[in-house]
UniProtKB/Swiss-Prot annotation:
<keyword id="KW-0288">FMN</keyword>
<dbReference type="InterPro" id="IPR024902">
    <property type="entry name" value="FAD_synth_RibL"/>
</dbReference>
<dbReference type="GO" id="GO:0046444">
    <property type="term" value="P:FMN metabolic process"/>
</dbReference>
<feature type="binding site">
    <location>
        <position position="100"/>
    </location>
    <ligand>
        <name>ATP</name>
    </ligand>
</feature>
<dbReference type="GO" id="GO:0005524">
    <property type="term" value="F:ATP binding"/>
</dbReference>
<keyword id="KW-0808">Transferase</keyword>
<keyword id="KW-0067">ATP-binding</keyword>
<comment type="similarity">
    <text>Belongs to the archaeal FAD synthase family.</text>
</comment>
<comment type="function">
    <text>Catalyzes the transfer of the AMP portion of ATP to flavin mononucleotide (FMN) to produce flavin adenine dinucleotide (FAD) coenzyme.</text>
</comment>
<keyword id="KW-0274">FAD</keyword>
<keyword id="KW-0547">Nucleotide-binding</keyword>
<comment type="pathway">
    <text>Cofactor biosynthesis; FAD biosynthesis; FAD from FMN: step 1/1.</text>
</comment>
<dbReference type="GO" id="GO:0003919">
    <property type="term" value="F:FMN adenylyltransferase activity"/>
</dbReference>
<protein>
    <recommendedName>
        <fullName>FAD synthase</fullName>
        <ecNumber>2.7.7.2</ecNumber>
    </recommendedName>
</protein>
<dbReference type="InterPro" id="IPR004821">
    <property type="entry name" value="Cyt_trans-like"/>
</dbReference>
<keyword id="KW-0548">Nucleotidyltransferase</keyword>
<dbReference type="GO" id="GO:0006747">
    <property type="term" value="P:FAD biosynthetic process"/>
</dbReference>
């Protein structure tokens, strides 16, 4: 008999103001396996990486993500860079990176291998209109429309 184990896909990100680009990304990631787990960046991590706090706190971002049909579970990450301990606990078969995430796939694979994980790391392409599928662009448009 074959294994009944589901293929687990893990993605991570800020997911601050959810837009169609996020939904397309999550849909494509879900198509890589049976189960999709999202790691939401901790508020401190967002502030450090982007130079500003997120618009929405991690708990709210997680709640919105849980409502998206492609997402099976959501975990809030720890402050700082990617937690290899958290990834080890989640036991992914695949990690899907977004097109704008600045991780090197091969470097990430090496780090995962060093802790005993043989995980496929895949970079997904932009699936939606690049100029409309970025939170920073949405914030710019909001300030242009409402702050003039």
């Amino acid at each position: 008999m074959g294994s009944d184990r589901k293929i687990r896909v893990v993605v991570g990100g800020v997911f601050d103001i959810i837009h169609a680009g996020h939904v397309h990304f999550l849909k494509m990631a879900k198509e890589l396996g049976d189960e999709l787990i999202v790691i939401v960046a901790h508020d401190e991590t967002v502030k450090k990486r982007k130079g500003r706090p997120p618009i929405n706190p991690a708990e709210d971002r997680a709640e919105v993500l849980k409502a998206i049909r492609y997402v099976d579970d959501v975990v809030i990450g720890k402050p700082g860079e990617i937690s290899l301990d958290l990834i080890k606990r989640l036991k992914p078969d695949v990690i899907a990176l977004g097109p704008d995430q600045d991780f090197d796939c091969e470097d990430l694979k090496r780090k995962l291998k060093s802790i005993g994980l043989n995980v496929e790391v895949i970079r997904l392409p932009y699936l939606y209109k690049k100029d409309r599928a970025k939170t920073s662009k949405i914030i710019e448009r909001i300030t242009e429309i409402f702050c003039d």
